[in-house]
Every structure is written in structure tokens, then in C-alpha cells.
Design a protein with these regions (language model features):
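Auxiliary tRNA-acceptor-end handling modules of aminoacyl-tRNA synthetases
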Residues: 1-59, 77, 86, 92-145, ...
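Soluble non-cytosolic domains of exported or imported proteins
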Residues: 18, 57, 61-69, 169-174, ...
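Short conserved micro-motifs at the rims of enzyme active sites and ligand-binding pockets
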Residues: 39, 65, 147-148, 230-236
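Zn2+-dependent metallopeptidase catalytic core
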Residues: 58-86
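Sec-exported extracytoplasmic/periplasmic mature domains
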Residues: 72-83, 184-185, 189, 226, ...
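The catalytic-center signature of Zn2+-dependent metalloproteases
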Residues: 91-111, 173-231
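Extended catalytic-interface subdomain
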Residues: 119, 124, 130-138, 176-187, ...
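Conserved catalytic/binding loops enriched for acidic/polar residues
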Residues: 196-402
């Protein structure tokens, strides 16, 4: 399960090296003393101290409700762990006696910057890995990056995703997913890049499947963006990433309270929990660099379990976009520049480039499993010959010219 860890270092005379005992990083969520029996019976209870994020008042007002939704989307995952109202978002106002720089308050902060990113660092108790406070920073130009993703990845299947300025509802849904992802880090979760592989490529073209899952990957902690696999005519409308099955599983693993005195006393309970979640939807793999990925299943910006097919479908959509770039980015006004057209064309090329690397990783690739002694699994397995051959053919057909 992909949690950040904080090692407790043990120095003793009986050791020949420093012993590292890792603890996952997490908030202290416990039922109130008077609710513990109810909790252990399976009833939902409120934690003694919920996780509260304050949305700083410099955050543009049009995005606040979407950011609040992204933060509180995690409530469903905490309910799986037995807690209701475990995480809440509040808008920071001047009348509140809250200092955003005070370590006692977790704050989501907006920065007027050209940087296109967001992050969610936290402060830990080094003795236990307990998260004491977390902050989320998002820079203004993340909106520009989201706009490009939405248009390039979904513009051919939803008209509202075309144009220089997208509707607030569309951009707000994207801001919701960014906030949700960063909060995931603030809860202790690492990236899970294999999560997108757990959804079959062809299922991403199914309205029934996508409506039921309501996300593009089994985890919001993947770098799986919008559904570029869906084709015009498929009828797919659930195109955005949201919390998935892995996220529910990971939060329950890390935050369910067992009432035990020591970590050792919980080991068997946690092992049993893992044994009941062996489905591929709950797989975890650490992040890899997209340019030199070893395991082709765990990559950035990819979708589906068949890189060749997903990329071919994505390219078909890119081919539909290119002839319409001028129409989507200009109004016909005399003297208007082609700056936006250039920006969209560059985004198309960048998306195409991603598809190539997704396929390339299959050539000489190795599947890497998280194995332990006695589980009977192979740690390393070469990608099947047929998949490597299909990947090579894709590159010869789509990249190289003769």
C-alpha cells in the first residue's frame, strides 16, 4: 500500500547496523472514548479530532466550491475506515482567529504565479509518523495546464471542451481533482502509477463501465488525467478522474482503528485485510520517470492496460483535433494572432509524444511485483514477446518514416 513512511532509527549494542523501523505517515484519527464500542461494532462515528483544511481567502472565489468538494471527496474513503465527517474544508475569513502561518492550522493557499503545479507537504512527528499539520499550495497557471489537458484529451467528444476559455463548471471539475490529489498526499498517500493499468482499455470506451467507476483510474493518486481513449460515438460522459477503489482501500488500511496497544498487535489484522483485497484494482507501484520506465504498467499520463491500443485510440482523437485548431482558437477577428492556436498545437504534439513513450516502455520492459517471502510470486517478469513485438510495430508505423 503506497504510504509515505518515516523511519524510526534504532541504535543498540546488539546490532551490527542501524535498524530502521518505518512507520506510515498519517493523521491521528481515533473515535471518542464514548464511541469506541460503537465504532468496533461497525457503526460510523465522528473522530475525536477531525482533519480540517482552511481555504485561504486569496483563493479566487469562483474555484472555492470546487476545491472544497475536492477536499471533502475523501469523506467517502474515511467512511470505509469507520469515520464520518473525518475531513472537512472551511473557507478562511478575516473574522476567524486563524493565522494561516500557524502550524496548528492546515491551509490551502493560492499563489499568483506562472508556475503550473500544486503540492501538498506536511509536518510530522518523527517519533511516530503522525501528521501534525499539512498545507496545500497551488499556483495560478495550473489552470492553463488543466485547460490544455481538457481540450486535447476530451475536446473531440465534448464540444464544451473546445475554445480559448472553457466553462467554469468544466475547469472547476478539474480543480476539484487537483485539490483531491494533493489532499491525498497530505493524508500520507504516495503516487500510484499502476492504478490506470487496472482499468481495461476497451472498458474506457464503455458508458456503462465509466458511469459506474466515475473515474479514469482506480486511484486519484495516479497521474491519469482525462479519458483520451473514448471516441466520438461511444457516448462516454464520465471523463474526469475522481477517487477510486484503490483510494478507498488505502485509506481503510491506514486509518481503520483497531484499539490495539502496539503496531505489532495489528499485524495479523492488517495482513488479513490485505489478503481480502488481492484484486488488481488494489495494486500499487511507485512512480517511475516517463523517459526510462522499467515497468510499462506504471507510467505517468497513461490510461488502460494496453498501451498500444490506448495510444492508437488517443492518436485517432489527435488527428481529429489538428484540422480544427484554428476554428477552436480564433474568432475571425481581424488582427487576431495565432498564439492560442500555437499553444494548442504544441499541446497536441506533447500528448502524441506521451503516447510514444507509453508504448516504448514495453520494449525490454519488466513487470515488477511487490513480493514478500512465501507469497509464491515472481518479483521480475519480462513483458511478453507478443506485446514487445506489437510495441515495435506501433513505433515503426506511427513514428518512423521510410
Amino acid at each position: 500500500v503506497g504510504y509515505f513512511t518515516n523511519p524510526l532509527l534504532n541504535y543498540s549494542d546488539g546490532q551490527q547496523r542501524v535498524d530502521k523501523k518505518p512507520f506510515i505517515t498519517r493523521w491521528r484519527l481515533e473515535p471518542k472514548p464514548e464511541d469506541r464500542e460503537r465504532y468496533l461494532r461497525g457503526e460510523l462515528v465522528e473522530p475525536a479530532k477531525p482533519i480540517v483544511f482552511y481555504i485561504e481567502n486569496s483563493t479566487p472565489s469562483r474555484w472555492r466550491k470546487y476545491i472544497k468538494q475536492g477536499i471533502e471527496d475523501w469523506q467517502a474513503a474515511f467512511e470505509r475506515a469507520g469515520f464520518k465527517n473525518a475531513i472537512v474544508a472551511r473557507e478562511l475569513t478575516d473574522s476567524m482567529n486563524v493565522d494561516k502561518d500557524d502550524v496548528n492550522y492546515s491551509v490551502l493557499t493560492y499563489a499568483a504565479s506562472t508556475k503550473a503545479n500544486a503540492m501538498g507537504p506536511s509536518i510530522l512527528d518523527p517519533r511516530s509518523g503522525e501528521i501534525l499539520e499539512a498545507d496545500i499550495m497551488w499556483w495560478h497557471n495550473v489552470l492553463g495546464m488543466l485547460q490544455e489537458w481538457i481540450t486535447v484529451q476530451t475536446g473531440v467528444v465534448r464540444p464544451e471542451a473546445r475554445g480559448v476559455r472553457l466553462p467554469d463548471e468544466l475547469m472547476g471539475d478539474a480543480m476539484r481533482f487537483v485539490a483531491c490529489h494533493e489532499v491525498g498526499h497530505s493524508l500520507g498517500l504516495r503516487h500510484n502509477m499502476i492504478a490506470s493499468w487496472t482499468f481495461p482499455t476497451d472498458s474506457l470506451r464503455s458508458k456503462t463501465f465509466t458511469d459506474r467507476m466515475n473515474t479514469t483510474s482506480s486511484s486519484i493518486m495516479d497521474y491519469a488525467r482525462f479519458n483520451y481513449v473514448a471516441q466520438p460515438g461511444d457516448g462516454v460522459t464520465a471523463l474526469s478522474p475522481h477517487i477510486g477503489p484503490y483510494d478507498m482501500f488505502a485509506i481503510e488500511y491506514g486509518y481503520r482503528w483497531y484499539g490495539k496497544e502496539t503496531p505489532e498487535a495489528e499485524k495479523d489484522l492488517l495482513a488479513d485485510f490485505l489478503s481480502r483485497h488481492a484484486d488488481r484494482l488494489y495494486k500499487y507501484s511507485e512512480a517511475q520517470d516517463v523517459r526510462d520506465a522499467v515497468d510499462p504498467r506504471a507510467q505517468n499520463e497513461d490510461l488502460g492496460d494496453d498501451a498500444v491500443r490506448s495510444s492508437l485510440l488517443g492518436i485517432e482523437n489527435l488527428k481529429r483535433i489538428v484540422p480544427q485548431i484554428i476554428q477552436w482558437t480564433t474568432t475571425g477577428e481581424k488582427g487576431q494572432t495565432y498564439e492560442e492556436a500555437s499553444r494548442l498545437y504544441y499541446a497536441v504534439i506533447n500528448q502524441w509524444n506521451n503516447y510514444l513513450y507509453h508504448v516504448l516502455a514495453n520494449i525490454g520492459g519488466i513487470y515488477i511485483e511487490n513480493t514478500v517471502v512465501g507469497d509464491g510470486q515472481k518479483t521480475y517478469t519480462f513483458v511478453e514477446k507478443e506485446k514487445q513485438q506489437a510495441a515495435l510495430k506501433f513505433l515503426l508505423d506511427e513514428v518512423l518514416t521510410y
